[in-house]
Structures are given as structure tokens and as C-alpha cells.
Design a protein with these regions (language model features):
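Flexible, polar/acidic helix-loop-strand segments at domain edges
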Residues: 119-178
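Active-site lining segments that contact anionic ligands and/or coordinate catalytic metals
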Residues: 72-74, 178, 183
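Hydrophobic alpha-helical segments, principally membrane-spanning helices and signal/leader peptides
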Residues: 10, 19, 113, 162-165
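An aromatic- and glycine-enriched ligand-binding surface/loop that stacks and positions planar moieties
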Residues: 2, 16-143
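Flexible helix-coil transition and linker loops at the boundaries of alpha-helical arrays
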Residues: 3-14
Length: 184
């Protein structure tokens, strides 16, 4: 877990923003307001000293959406989800296949509502490691393990294998990742 720069580390600090994240947020505000020099300067305070603030990039892009590493070095601002009975993320239900596969996966509450365009999918080279995380075209049946192929690419970031219902996903929703700060 990333260290808090101006807070004492304790269990009660979980979910609190640290100094580096605050600077990144200020940089985004300046950028939004069109004050590009202030944005550049504020973001540089963190980007040029990322290790001091506990930020960096995961070696594996997919780690941003895994339970054990999603609150890691790239997490600047995100919505934390937990397993039931706590609040959970409904993104898996919105992205899961309902009409694009032959048959059913044996998973309830899949709506196939958040569908990326074929044009977006085609923009990713097959060698781009982000493609496998961002999109999913094959799904395993919950009970039989049979692989069912979707006729269209669907969002893959919030898909968790083995869940019996699509609306119980606990993958965090990233609002700002450290990669965004670098790009800004």
C-alpha cells in the first residue's frame, strides 16, 4: 500500500487522500481551467518525485483491476468497493454478456449495457497488452467452464471470474490513475 506523506499510517487513514494525490488533483483543476503552466508545474511536483509520494506504474497494466493490487501505486483517486454486505460495483453487470454469446454463462444480472465500439477495439494492436484487460471476447461458463465467444468485444476491466451474479463485483472504480497524471 502506498505511504501517506502527511498522515500517520493507521487503519483509520484507509481511503484518505495523501499530499501527492492532492497535488495531482490541483494539477487537473488548473488544466481544466486552462492554466497550463500552473498545471504543468503542480503535476511536475509529483511526477518528478514519484517515489517520494509513493506513485509509479504497475509493470502489469491489469494489476490496476485486481483485488490485491488495485489500490496500489497507480491509484490516485478511486471509489473503493467491498464484497457484500458492503457497497459493490455494478460494472460487471453492465459489461457482462447477455445477448452476444450463444446461450447463458450461468451468471445472473448481466445486462450488456456498456459496450465499447468495434472502432475502439480495432484501434488496439493485438500486441498491446492493454487490449486483453480493456476488452473481453471469451467468457467461461460458471458451472461447466465451457468457453463461450462473444460476437462483439465487451469491457473486461471489471470482469471477475467465478462470481455467480454480475452485480456483486468489488473491483474499484478508478477516477484518476497515476498514468493520467503523467499524461496531463
Amino acid at each position: 500500500m502506498r505511504k501517506n506523506i502527511f498522515l500517520e499510517d493507521s487503519a483509520s487513514d484507509e481511503g484518505r487522500i495523501n499530499k501527492g494525490a492532492a497535488k495531482i488533483l490541483f494539477g487537473k483543476v488548473y488544466l481544466t481551467k486552462g492554466d497550463f503552466q500552473k498545471a504543468k508545474d503542480k503535476l511536475a511536483e509529483v511526477v518528478e518525485h514519484e517515489s517520494e509520494y509513493g506513485f509509479g506504474l504497475h509493470k502489469d497494466y491489469h494489476a490496476n483491476w485486481l483485488r490485491d493490487t488495485e489500490a496500489g501505486i497507480e491509484a490516485v483517486l478511486y471509489i473503493e468497493y467491498k464484497e457484500p454486505p458492503f457497497q459493490h460495483n455494478g460494472e460487471m453487470a453492465l459489461a457482462g454478456p447477455k445477448y452476444s454469446i450463444p446461450g447463458s454463462l450461468g451468471i445472473s444480472a448481466l445486462n450488456e449495457a456498456d459496450i465499447p465500439t468495434q472502432e475502439l477495439y480495432d484501434q488496439f494492436d493485438n500486441r498491446d497488452l492493454r487490449k486483453k484487460t480493456n476488452f473481453k471476447t471469451e467468457f467461461a461458463h460458471l458451472k461447466t467452464g465451457e468457453i463461450l465467444k462473444s460476437s462483439i468485444p465487451l469491457s473486461g476491466k471489471f470482469w471477475v471470474e467465478g462470481l455467480e451474479t454480475g452485480d456483486r463485483c468489488d473491483v474499484n472504480m478508478h477516477i484518476i490513475r497515476y498514468a493520467d497524471a503523467i499524461l496531463m
